[in-house]
Amino acid sequence: MRLFSNWPGICGLSSKYYYLPRGQPQTNLRTELTSLHRAVTWVYSKIFDIPFYSLVPYISERLSLETDFLNEADNSENMARLIAGEPRLRDRVYIPKVWRELSSKRVMTAEWIEGVRLWDKDAITRSWRGGWRQGSPGCHGTPMDPPAKTGAPMNPQLAKVKPERNHWRGQNNRGGLGLSLKDVMTTMVDLFSAQMFLWGLVHCDPHPGNIFIRRKPSGRPELVLIDHGLYIHMDPNFRHQYARLWKAMLTFDNDTLGEIVKTWGVNNPDIFASATLMRPYRGGDLSTQRGLEGLSKSEKAQRHYEMQQAARKAIRDILGDETKWPQELIFIGRNLRIVQANNQFLGSPVNRVKITGTWASRALVESADLPLSEKIRNLGRHVVFRIVLFTSDLFFWFTKIRQFLHLGGGMEDSIEAQMQGMAKDMGVELNQNIFEG
């Protein structure tokens, strides 16, 4: 159920999309969710012989916290504070204010936002008709409603639901925010990279329905992030390891890659790197890939069962020692996959892998948790790292030219096709919608 105030200045009231039978305690709901998830995961673990069941307590805890709006309010305020303290993001990202005095575990009251959903590409990119030095309704001093006009009044029935605030689209309603998809997507990747590598507080449900885009009076885009129920916290040691992992993957530093994943109990660095990058990793020993290369289609069909067994083994190798495996990686992977899908949906306007890797390397220089001597060493490595990333730019611009000439898709389409092909060779069909909210 979702209810909204219909007057500017009064916030929206939301109790989310959870079905809560009248009189049923919230603890019962959490118990039911946990029991159902345990049962399904146990069946999967037994049928496919993959150690999923040990992950149930952590996943169930995260999902149950989504039903607690006080937890969501805490996450929302913490994220707003972190963004306000980061000069590279504070003018590009906005977190709606929460009214604590009007909120509880079952209901959260938050600031009303007028914006365009991420999936409405036309509304984001069409020309702006809202006036000079004006922004989206309610954005940084822009009035929520235009000055009163003497024309025909609004439909009174519609006004009871919510006032129309489409004056910025122009008389024929064909205008838009006049923004660049590249600027929008850059802000998104910057935001979630900072969450992973700088702050260790990661929003794990960044699908298009949870992201609004507004136009500031300056003409620049502003990303509004909502729905802060599903977060994970990364301790400083794990956060530094994860940043080093990304640097190692992008520079083919297989020694560092192997060292890090070994401490996590992972037995197959290549497959793990591919799953993290969302593209086949070409820098390791390629043992898994070589086992599949050189086979004809008929040979692959004959070996279908063996390849499925190899796929199961690869997953077991990724999970490795369940006592060492960082369970946060489940939801970090979800975030990465959804952000990749968002970039793909918008036509791959940015080199997501390069931006993410740059934040990882930069975090090892800027993190307050690291000693000064290590920061200085990482600074020199960061300069070298930026040079190495030039090859990633070459591939990105190759795909952009190909896309412009209508000879193929964008960078994310190529990555998606490579991953689909790699998985198919292993007897697995990837469901591209599995992480998209």
Question: At which residue positions do the language-model features occur?
Answer:
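Long, hydrophobic, amphipathic alpha-helical segments used as structural scaffolds
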Residues: 87, 200, 346-350
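Residue-level signature of catalytic and energy-coupling elements of molecular machines
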Residues: 72, 109, 207, 227, ...
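Conserved ATP-binding subdomain of kinase catalytic cores across diverse folds
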Residues: 1-166
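Helix-rich C-lobe and terminal helical cap/extension of kinase-like folds
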Residues: 57-59, 104, 113-115, 120-187, ...
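Conserved catalytic-loop position in the HRD/HxD motif
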Residues: 200, 205-207
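Hydrophobic residue at the +6 position relative to the catalytic HRD Asp in the kinase catalytic loop
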Residues: 209-213
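Conserved helicase/translocase P-loop NTPase motor core
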Residues: 183-199
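Short, charged/polar micro-motifs that form catalytic or ligand-binding hotspots
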Residues: 22-26, 62, 66, 199, ...
